Amino acid sequence: MVLLPAFLDGLARTVSTKKGKKLSEDEDGGREIAKSMIKDSKKNSTLLGTSGFVSSESSKRFTSICSNRGEKGINQDRAIVWEGFGCQEDITFCGMFDGHGPWGHVIAKRVKKSFPSSLLCQWQQTLASLSSSPECSSPFDLWKQACLKTFSIIDLDLKISPSIDSYCSGCTALTAVLQGDHLVIANAGDSRAVIATTSDDGNGLVPVQLSVDFKPNIPEEAERIKQSDGRLFCLDDEPGVYRVGMPNGGSLGLAVSRAFGDYCLKDFGLVSEPEVTYRKITDKDQFLILATDGMWDVMTNNEAVEIVRGVKERRKSAKRLVERAVTLWRRKRRSIAMDDISVLCLFFRPS
């Protein structure tokens, strides 16, 4: 166990509000407080939910976002970055949500809207439970517990919502919380997080993948699906793309093994539980890339890092990745309808 009095004292500043209310006193009240924080952040230009960029004078971080609609109809990708998350100057929250199915765009939009406030509530409740003890868990344990609870709550919220049909629709989720030099990644789906770090010889950058692309044919995922009587199969026109389906579901299936929604498959191995990982950011680490599978389907980790490295204006970094991915898609997969492509680039320090 690690003693963290200073760390917890810093987080505790988010407990009190102008009205003197505490997040831990009432979960509904906590959500209202979080929503109020979101409104204030939008006014102060520290929260971005569309293509563009946001910078933080206090943390010296810079984030760029870009999204491109594919050839399948409505853009079902949603992204968000929130500098000063929870009124903490040194915390940045990033989220990438990729919808699928008839209601995928609606679900991704709802998750993007509700996830930050829910995470704030769970973060505060976890903090309150830990701060009552003289010995507290590490920063990673704190965020991991909050993330696991949030993913569960978001999935249940979709299930009981009378206004959204998430039986055969859903969305993946990839989130990042950066507090000081603590980076926590939570992933349920096939979007990917890649960090660019200085090579050992100091002459370049190398990519380090921080998340797993949760496809149904990954051994651990496939075993869970089989144990749940789910079916693994590929469509005739996509022989290398494995899907999870119902035992007698015909061609109905999903090409990821973890996601929000899709309740027709939740009894057959699909789960919404994320994998939560940690990295201590050092001076060698330069930037983080979060992107939906539309980009990674046609671009390697190394290619992505090199493209961002070569961009002179950081605000154009995400856009440059999207443009390159579109070009590669048309060259490599011209017989397949282009997927939505969304990218977020987070730079850790000033240029």
From Swiss-Prot:
GO terms for molecular function: metal ion binding; protein serine/threonine phosphatase activity. It comes from the Eukaryota. Keywords: Hydrolase, Magnesium, Manganese, Metal-binding, Protein phosphatase. Binds 2 magnesium or manganese ions per subunit. One of its GO terms (cellular component) is cytoplasm. Transmembrane segments: none annotated. GO terms for biological process: drought recovery; microtubule cytoskeleton organization; negative regulation of growth; protein dephosphorylation. PROSITE patterns: PPM_2. It catalyses: O-phospho-L-seryl-[protein] + H2O = L-seryl-[protein] + phosphate; O-phospho-L-threonyl-[protein] + H2O = L-threonyl-[protein] + phosphate. Its EC number is 3.1.3.16. Residues 62-348 form the PPM-type phosphatase domain. Mn(2+) 1 binds at residues 98-99. Belongs to the PP2C family. This is Probable protein phosphatase 2C 41.
